Regions:
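The −1 position to Zn-ligating cysteines in a subset of zinc-ribbon hairpins
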Residues: 15
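A short, terminal or domain-edge coil/loop segment
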Residues: 21-24, 29, 82-89
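A broad, low-amplitude sensor of folded, mature protein cores
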Residues: 21, 26, 62, 99-100
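Charged/polar positions within long, soluble alpha-helices
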Residues: 21-24, 47, 54, 263
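Histidine-centered nuclease catalytic patch
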Residues: 1-12, 23-40
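Domain-exit/linker segments immediately C-terminal to small folded modules
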Residues: 32-86
Length: 265
């Protein structure tokens, strides 16, 4: 949980002075996930102890509202239950943040060479088609992300002044997370290819292209939180511009490297 998220009133948990100090002094032992799990467990225990009909109804209603969110983080589930101000955006940010976490970790590990996959060989005659497929894979995922992140999320958030649909937000964010997974897989395919030696320079130019798009995608959750945090909240439109592109001169370099490879074959 970021500092901006901690500062939001909706994320508050009532603690006694002693417990409050323990949590503040040792945040590693008392993670946000642990505290929210405690809060939900405490709520269930109180409801059971009271034994009131309305408490039982509320618990069943909460379980119904959380259907589909069983695998989501504790914070995401709490947002669904509490529906604080701007909950639609905070839920989106938390689902993406938690969904991106393992992808981001694995991508960083890939760049540092912490793991490797079996190498695939390819013949010269198939290299052009292979390169075209990798680029199409990247473009297709970016197009899907653009539509999901604009049309899909705007519909899921609901019209101005009306509440959004939490299950629609869950589904759309999962589409974006899936696209990030596919981009990571494309990056792995490119890195663990063994082309004929004269095509190695072309392959090197493809390394990092899918990852470049991933790094742009990872900016989304923190940006949303920064705009909805209590201290940064401001009226008006907020627009995040993500740039999915290639390095300057990349296309020309690929064409040149490919032509040189063909001439030397």
């Amino acid at each position: 949980m970021t500092d901006a998220e901690r500062s939001q009133e909706a994320n508050g948990i009532w603690l006694c002075r002693t417990c409050h100090k323990k949590v503040d002094d040792d945040p590693n032992s008392f993670s946000a996930e642990l505290l929210f799990e405690w809060k939900q467990s405490h709520t269930r225990k109180i409801a059971d102890g009271l034994g009131k009909t309305d408490a039982g109804f509320r618990e069943r209603a909460d379980r119904e509202r959380l259907k589909g969110f069983e695998a989501s983080s504790s914070l995401a589930r709490q947002i669904v239950l509490d529906k604080p101000l701007f909950w639609e955006y905070n839920l989106t940010a938390e689902l993406l943040r938690s969904g991106f976490a393992h992808i981001k970790f694995k991508y960083e590990a890939l760049k540092q060479g912490f793991y490797a996959l079996p190498v695939a060989r390819i013949d010269s005659d198939d290299f052009a088609d292979w390169a075209d497929v990798q680029m199409r894979n990247i473009v297709n995922q970016i197009e899907a992300i653009k539509l999901a992140g604009t049309v899909g999320l705007l519909e899921a958030w609901g019209p101005p002044g009306q509440p959004g649909q939490e299950r629609d937000i869950l589904q759309i964010t999962q589409f974006i997370i899936d696209a990030a997974e596919h981009l990571l897989k494309t990056e792995e395919v490119v890195r663990f290819l063994k082309p004929p030696s004269h095509f190695e320079k072309v392959q090197e130019l493809y390394i990092g292209i899918a990852g470049r798009q991933l790094e742009e995608l990872f900016k989304i959750p923190d940006w949303i939180i920064s705009k909805t945090s209590d201290e940064n909240l401001a009226p008006g439109d907020h627009i995040l511009k993500l740039v999915f592109d290639m390095p300057d001169g990349w296309v020309e370099q690929v064409i040149k490297a490919y032509n040189e490879a063909v001439d030397s074959a």
